[in-house]
Every structure is written in C-alpha cells, then in structure tokens.
Amino acid sequence: MDTNWLYVLLQKSTADPLERLKLGNVILNEISQRKVSPHPKLVNDFLDVMSGWLTGSNFKVTIIGLEILDAALRTSPEVLASYYFDRLSVLIERMGDAKVQVREMAINLCRQLAYLENSSPVMLLDRLCVHGTGFEHKQWLVKVGSLNILRDFLSDSFALVIPQAINLIPQLCRLTNDPNSEVRDASTNCLVDLMVFGGKSIIAKIANTRILNEQKMATLLQRYESTIATRGDLPPKHSIPIETSSIPRNNLLRRSLRSPAKIIHPSASTTSFTSSARLSTPPRTNAPSLSPSPSTPSPLSLPAANGRSRDLARSSLRAPAGMSLSRYRSSSCAPAAQCAITLDDFKKAFNAVPKISIYSNSDVREKLETANSVLRNANEDWSKRANQLKLIRSVILNSDDSIDQRLLLSLINELADALEFSIRDLRSQIVREAAITCSFLFEHFGMDVRNVAECVLPAALAQVAVSTKIMASSAATLTVFIVQKIQTRQIFQTLFDLSTSKSKEQRRQLANLLETLISSWDLKVKQPILKSISQLVQNAICDADGETRVAGRKAFAKLEQLHGAAADQIFRELDPAKQKMLRDGVSSSSSSLNSDRDNNNQKQPQQPQQNISQKFLSQRSASALDNKSQVLSIAKPQQSNPSRPTAMPVNNRLPKSSTSSSFSAVRSSGYGQSRAKTPSDGFGGTNFNNNNNNNNKSSSSSPSTSTHQTPIQRVASNLGSSSFVASLTQEQASSLQNAMDLAKDEMSKNNEDDEFLLAEVRKTPPKETSPPASLYARGYGNGSNGSNNSSNNSIQSVEHILKACTSSSINEKRDAIISLSQKLLDRNLDSLECKNIGDTLSRLLAEGNTTLIISILETISIFVKCHYKKLDGWLKLALGKLFAKMGADSLPNVKSALSSTQKMFLTTFDPSTQLKEVCDFMCDPVHLLAPKSRLALLEYICLLFEEIWPEDPRCLERQTQLDTPYTRAAVRKMFAWMFDPRIGAILMPACERLVCALFALNAADFTMIFGDLPPECRDWAYRILQLNGQQQSAQRQQIMEKEAITMTNNNYKPCPPEVEKFEKVSVKASFSTYEATRVPEPQDYRKPTVHLAKNHVEQAAYIRNQMDLMRDFQKPDRVNEAMANLHGMMCEGSFTLWNQFFDELLDEIYQILSTLSQSIRKKLAMRILQKMCTAQATKLFDSTEIAISKVLQCACTSEDNTMSVAAEDCLRILATHLPLPRIVQISRRILSQDDDDQRGVLILKMLTRMFQDIDVDELHMIVDDVAPCFVSAYDSTSSSVRKCAVFGLVALVQRVGMPRLETHLRKLNATKLNLIDLYVGRAKSSESGTSSN
C-alpha cells in the first residue's frame, strides 16, 4: 500500500489551506481517472482526510473535498459506498453550511449515494431519521436539505419510501410549526407531495395525527386540490392503502439485499423514469438453442408450466447472415430488430386468454378489484399474478354492450399503479404479461387510458436497459404501442428526458421511437414540440453508439419526408462528416427519397476516388460548379447503371418534367444545403433562352423508360409517387406543381452553403489550380451580369472571410483578419454584415490569442471608425470584451493598442450612448469581471465625465442630465464593489475620481442620486469632495501664477473658459483615499511631473533628490515615496535622462531588493526594474544574471505571499527583453545546482511564459537546451515543481510539436507521457472550442 498513488498523495496533506487546495487539485485529477484500491486502511485514511477537509473553516477546501468525494464515488462506487454511509454524518452537517454551493454539493452527493449498488433511498432516509440529525437537526438549513431529499425520493422512488414517509408524517407536521419560515415551507411542500402521490389514504393519515390545526389543514387541502387541478388529466397515481404498505417495503428491502441494485441516480441530467429503474437484475441464464422453424408456436399462447424455458428460448436472437453470434448477442433488443417479443407476438397474445362470463357491472368491478389487489401484492405467487393479467384482457374482451364503459374505464385507470408495479417486476413472465396487457389496453381504448400509459412508460423504458432479452424486448415493444396510440405532451416529455440517459440501450430505443412518433402522431400535436423533436433527432445522429446513430438517421429520413424545414435546420447545424454520413444513411434507409437519387445515380456513373465535397456535389447540377459543365452535359451521352437494382419495375417508372426533376434533385440531395441558380433549373439569366433551358434539362436527366405516359401520371410523377399524389386530379396536381415551382424559385437563390461548398471546390480543383485571389474576383452565378457578380462577390467574400476568422489555424486566421480590415474600408456594408462582423470580432477579442491581439484591435478600430452608426447594438458587448482584455496582464505594446482602441470608442460613439451602455453592462449580473477589469470600466466612465478630448463637440457637457435609472444603478454597483474587502483597495482611487467627476459635471443631479443612497455612502462621498476641495485651495494661487498646466496622465485637459478651468482643476487635480480621511493632518500627494520631460535641469535635480531619499533605508516611508515618484515619472514618460542615471538607479534597485527590511515595498522596486528593462533593455545585457538572481532572492526571502506573483511578472519581462542565450544558460544553471523548490518553480514558470511569447524559430533553437531541464524537473519530489514541469512540456509540445521533443521525452515512463498527452489534448480541445464559438 505504501506505493499506492493515493497513499502517497494523502501523506502530503497538511493543515495549510493553500497546500490543501494544491493537493486537492492533484487528487481530483488522479481520482477522476483511476479507481480507488479496496484496501480498508487506505479507504479509511482517504475518508478521514476528506472528512477533515469538510469540517474545516475554509469553504474552498470544503468544495474541493466534496468534488473529490463525488469523483471517487463515480469511479469506484462498489468500493466506497459502504464507507460513505459510515461517514454520512459529515455530509449531513455540510448540508447546513453557510455557502450555497457547499450545501448543494452535499445534497447532490447524498442523492447519488442513495442510488448506488447495495444501497437505496430507504437506507439514506433511515440515517436522516436518527435522533439529532436530518429532520431533527438543530441547524435549520440541514432540515431544509433533508426535506428536499425526501421530496426527491417521493417523486422518483415513491414505492420504496412510502412506508418511511408515512412514519415521518408526525415529524413533518411538527416541522410546519418550526420557528424558521423556510423549514415550514419545505415541510408543507413535502406534505403536499405526499398527499398528491399517496391519495386520500395519506390525507386521512395526516388528519388523524391532529397535530395540524384546522387552518393549516385547510391550506394543505387547498394546495392539494390546486396541484391536482393544474395537472389536468393526471390524478394521483400512487394511492397505496396504508394497511398493506409494510409488505411491499419488506419485500423490496429483501430484494435490495439479495442482489446488487441497478437503480440509476436521478441527477439534474437524468430523468424520472431512469431513477425508478428496477431494483435488481437476475443473473444470466444460458438459453437453449433456438429452433429456426417458423412453425414454432408463440409462447404467449402456451400454458405456463414450462413458460420459463420457452421464454428463454424466445429471448435468444437469431443472428443475421454474415454476423457472428457472439457479437449479435451483445446488442440490445429493439422493436424493429429480431428480438424475443415483437409487435406481431403481442397482437397474437391479445386474445390468448381464458374464457369467462360477465353478467353485470358489479361482476366487472369485483374481478378488476381482485386483480388490482393481487398485482399489488409482491409476495403473491407469480403464476397467480400472471393469470390476473390475462384476466384483465379477458374481462375487456368478454364485456358486452350492457357493461357501463365509463365504469370500465375508471376501473382500468385505477390499475395504473398495479400495472406499473408489474412492469418493474423481476420475473420475465410477469413483465411480459404486463406489457401485453398494457399494449392491449392501449390498442383497445386508445387515449381513454392515457393515464395508464403515462404511468407505465417510465417503468417500461427503465426495463429496456436490462440484460434479460425477454424483459427488454417486451418493454421495448410496449413503448412502441404507447407512442403509437397515446399522443400527449406528457408522453413526449418522458421521451425527451430519456435523451440524457447513460444507457445506450435506452437512447437506441428512443431513436426508434422517434421514427414512430414522427410518422404516427397528429400534426396538431407535433407542431408545438417540433423543435424538441428535431433536437432529439440531432442528438441521436450525433450519439456515441453506432446503432443509435443508424436509428437516428432513419428518424431523420422520416422527419425530412414530413417536415422538410426542420430537417434542413438539423442538416445545417451538423459538421461535414455527419452530413456525409447522414446522406449515406438516408439514401439507404428512406424509401421516400430513393426515387430521385436512384435516377440521378443511374444517369451518371460514379467517378473513382472522389473526395467528400465532390461526392456531395455529385448530386447537384454540374453547371453550379463550372461554366463549362453545360457543354459537357450536352456532349456527354446518356448512360444508366444496369447493375443497380430498382425499387419498381422499369415499365412503372414515370417520366419527370424538367422543372420538377431539378427541384426534387435539389430537395433530396442537400437536405437544406445549397440551392443555386443553375441553367438546368431554367434560371440562368439572359444568356439562356427557353430553348436552351429545355435542351439543358433534357440533357441533364435520363430519358424515360416508361411506355405508358398519361398527363395525370406525368404530373403525379413530378410530385412523387405517394398515394396522396396519385389521388389528385389533373387540376389539383397542376396547382400543386405551380406552387412547388414558386418554392423552387425561392430555394434556388445563393446562400451561405453555396459559398462554403463551392469555395472548397475552387480551392482544390481536381486537375487545374487557380490563384487564391480568384476567390474574391469570380462570381458564383453562371448567367448573371457584371453588377450581380460584383454584388454577390462582395457579400460572399465577407462571409468567407468571417468563416476563415474562426479557423483553428493561426496563419489562416491572421490572413483573414488582414482581409477583413481591408474589407471594412468599404462603408457600404449593410447592417446584417456589420452585425456578423461585430460578433466575429468580439469572439476573436475574447479568445486571448497573444499573437493576433494587436491585429484584432487595429481591425476593431477600423470597424468602429467606418461603421459606428450601425453598431449601437454591438457597443455593449464590445466594451465588455475590451474591459475584460484591459484587465488581463499584457505586454506594453498590447496595452498601447488597447488604449488606442479605447480612445477610438470614446471619440467615435455618442458619449450619452456610451454612458448608458457601460452602466447597463456594469449592472448586468451575467457579466462577472475581474478586479482589474472593473477598474478599467470605472476609469472609462471617468473619461466620459472628464472630457478628455474637449475638441470633440459631442463630449458630455456641463449640466448634462445624469439622474437616470441606469446611472443610479451604476453608482450603487460602484459602492458595492468599493466596500468589497477583497477588491476595495484596488478600486478606491477610481471610485473617488468618479465621484468628483460626477459632482463637477452636474452637482444638482449628483445631489439627487446620492440623496437616495445609504448614509455611509453619502458621508463618504461628501468627505471625499470636502477633502479634495481643501487640498486644492492651497494650490489655486500657484495655478493662477502659471500660464498653462498640462495634465499628461491622460486624465485631464483644461477647457478654454477661465472660470471652468479653475472649477475643474479644483476638483480633478488629485484624489485622496478613504484612509486619508482618518488622519488629522493632510498628507502630501504626488504631483505630476510631465513638465519635467523637456526641462532637463529640473528633471535631473528632481531625480537626484528622489535617489538620495532612496538611500536612506532607516526611513522606509521616504524610500517608498521616492520609488513611487520615480515609478510615476516612468509611467508618465517624463523620465528621459536614462544615460545619466540608469546605472546609479539600477544599483539602488539591487540594494533595495537585497535588503531584509519588510517595510520597504520591494514589489514597487520590481516594477521599476520592469520599466527600466522595457525602456533600456540593452543596458541590462551585462547584468542579466544579477537581475534574475536579485529577483529570485527577493521572492524567496520575503514573508509576503503575493511577492511571488510580482516576481513572476518581473521575470517574464526580463526573459522576453534580455538575450535569449543568457536566459537559457542562467536557467539551466539554477535548475541543475539549486535545491530550492521555490526558485525552481519561478524559473520554470518564467521559461513557460517565455515559450508562449517568443517566435517559433527562436524556440526551435533552444529546445535541446531547455527540454532536458523540464524532463529532469518532472522527476522532482516537489509536487509544485512537477506541476510546473508538466505545464512547460505541454507549452513546448504545443509550439514545436511532439516529434521535435520525442528524443527528450523517451526518458519518461508511460504514465507521465499519458499525462502530458492528456493536457495537450485538453489544450487543443479548449482552443478549438473557443475558435468555433
């Protein structure tokens, strides 16, 4: 056990929450892919550690612990289920956690635990009923969670938990008097559900407790009646007598202990019927050999003496020719296959019942009530129950007209629960007889017994997944009868919930039922749910199971035949591979579509070695691909394929007119794909007259081989060969033909699919190549004039460029962005194109591709500049993406591009519109911004208020109305952010600045807005304004003496009017912080130094003064202030004397990084070092090793936990600006000689980030030097070092490819290589998913 992976990881568990989070992520990744060893000590140690995590005070550790327990339960349920029950009290306690996420995860884990093998909801409820826990816990949240679990069990497993629920009625009634309102509501809901499911007997039981007063009882009855009324035709289904409830429970408990349970966990994605699957599955029995004789009588009509052996004989499958018997036995039964029970067998068994005599209504009532009581009793002999099922059919068959039909139907509807219980039985004879009886009821009464159908359908679908063929096939056949005869919304909802089942047999049966539903249901019933039907068909086509996909393609063929528009929509949403498979599947399975395709296939022989696009386009008119195809089609002789079998005799094949022939070809070959204007359709343009059209049509279609041609037959053949068309008269057929011609005209227009498919053909022609520029210079219509060509070319070029922008290839995406920026210069783009372009640019901006971000930002600037009048609806989304990007760490050139793009937005759009959109985005709860992104948003609003570019006449003017609902909401949101202890310190300066700017812009509206805020917000705002005014009063005299002051921090520019100038400066010159208001004496604030950029004398004196202050380590405050002033100069661009002060300043920075004082802000020194490296990188070449060593020393010796983050940023700047060979040499020496894990982690992270930033050619040069370092680091004993090594190797594989690193990765074992492959696959899948979106 000492070498077990889980044991090794558990030994690293500590009390530090940060270490627990790191270790938890490693355990979660491993335990999601590996099974837990069944060693008792290991499992107990694992659960002890997790219990400690769950009972800790850090909720993040609790969440990761619950995720680990959930993943372990999914991978190793047979090992951990019993151990979890021993520690169930910990989960129950977590149900009362203060965090909603922790409570929900604990409740879901308890639900999952109840539906595992050797477990049941009964066992979990027993634990919740223990005194002091669950329903009697002192924490009200635990009570609410326990009540919610009980409600779920009542809904999903009523038959199992009804005895316990009845015993809990007094406790539930007492909880309705709980002091907490949520507990009272939850207990009331449980009682209402229990009344609905249990019926009048449960209502009487609740009333007999006499715990509830009359008012509460009346309220419960009222809610019960309203619930029944809202369910329409769904009366309570589970009215089980109380006096017999203990017998089924004991029996069910005995069954659950006798064999492993097969109950499926009812999660949010599973359905109600899967959760109520059968409790256990009997072992497989070797079936005798099946006799191939068709004269074998059906076992349904034989006596029950040897029914078991005959059932097993019937349950064997006859393997088709060419298929191995073992393989065929592994597939599940479907009603359409050769299963143990088929539709014909059911219909034959309908009348195979004993003869009885029915004399009166009371006789019918007596017999059916007897059958109901026998079927409900699980301890009754199975043969008696089977006879009672036959008796039900016999009663119906032998009832004459004197029997009251309403009485008969009411008695049959009362059998719903008994029949459902029989369908779930463990004996195949009972399941078969119950399925036959239910099918007989649906066949005989139809919609009158829909309640029975809705009750037994979940049970039947659950039985489809069992391994016993006779039971699975009986249930599958029953579902076919239900779907055929019962057409209600509840039936479809049950089927829709089955789409998320994990059982491939159930999903396969659903696909088969979809075909039946589409073909048999009435149009009025299907119309409201047609979109959901299409979704199910699409899910079946894309299913992981091959047989399910085949059934899904058959359902698609039926859907295309009856609802073409829905089928076209499905086809357009599928990828090309699925489309090709769908075409092949439909053409081979749909008889309604074979006629046109058979004709097309017989007209032209198949060309060898065609690619996918050519095979797809072979169904289309050749003139849609090439202008020369018309001549080729005329010159080519007519051929037919004599070897292809025909669906009907040759003399029955009717001729088709040219118009309908082309229409049907387009309609059946593409399924919603391109319908282009072709000369063969008669819409070529002015270059083709009617005679040419007729010639083309006759040349592109095979001559008719029929000798019997009548006008009515000719018209009918144009429309198809169905019975409906054959019944039309000449006038009706002609009218229908005209309507179809008009529809064909609309469908023959070019669309996106034409552009996509034809562009692919032009890219890779079979014999000759064309330059890429022809893609934009050629038109796609064959007979259109020049103007049409240019118009279509412009539209389709934009669409093609946008599709290329979503490519996963970086080079193709880069070329598409360049083409798009050129296309955007055309100001004639319509609104739809602008909308598509805006959506594409938003997705590109959100991808986070560092290599293309500058090109994307430049393209967005051009787009905004040229088409801003059409982009009001896109402004909110674009600003949100821009704020998110500005909040991320990026290189200086990227920040400059972001600033330029932001300025383009500010100077182009109307300021009032910008303010409204930004405020709406700020208050939208859907958008969750990072702290730095929130800071960028607040600064953007400040820029709108402060008139950064007063030369723009559209800027916000003074006295602009700001008292609007969206401004009020934004101010409240700002205070919510500011008072957040996690991010308030970051946002405080921007909030102060925003308050001052708002007051300066419109003081009256400022007073109205802040008058409705809480007192603490008003006091803070007024204090900021007062303090700001006091600070500025001392500076007004200096401002008046100077002729002009330019605020160069891109935050202020004074307006020409002198009075306004003083008003603005008095408010905007500088801002304090909230902490400054608590200091009695005002502090000195840093003054802008932009005016020193050109005055070298004053600049040198200022820098010398600050550097003298930096040398006084005895006064850390002065050192920090001096560093802040110098850093501010560098940010403002006023530090220009690099040659004079660079070496001296670098020496001071090194000394600060080396000092052991914790009062000096070393992170600020690192930022200064970054600025120096960015501005004068060549001066640091000689001291590269010293700079890296100082940063590493500072990060490793500091007590600040955030110092490592600043060190990572500094090392990344150094690595990307200093000589690459020196960086690699220093890194190798540190990794090989230094044993400090923290230094190794920082170096590995620096190299990993460098891999992502440098060019591929440079990376290829250093791969052989750095790859061995990462491979050796992968063997480190420190998990953090190994993690960084894995990430570095993954980054290398992504950039240079696996073959380039193959020689270095040979040293790793298979497990480590698999982990690298796993992370590389995840990175590629996430990248492709982002690009596709």
From Swiss-Prot:
It comes from the Eukaryota. Residues 269-311, 579-711, 764-792 are annotated as: Disordered. SUPFAM superfamilies: ARM repeat. The keyword Iron-sulfur does not apply. The keyword Cytoplasm applies. Microtubule plus-end tracking protein that promotes the stabilization of dynamic microtubules. This is Protein CLASP-1. The gene is cls-1.
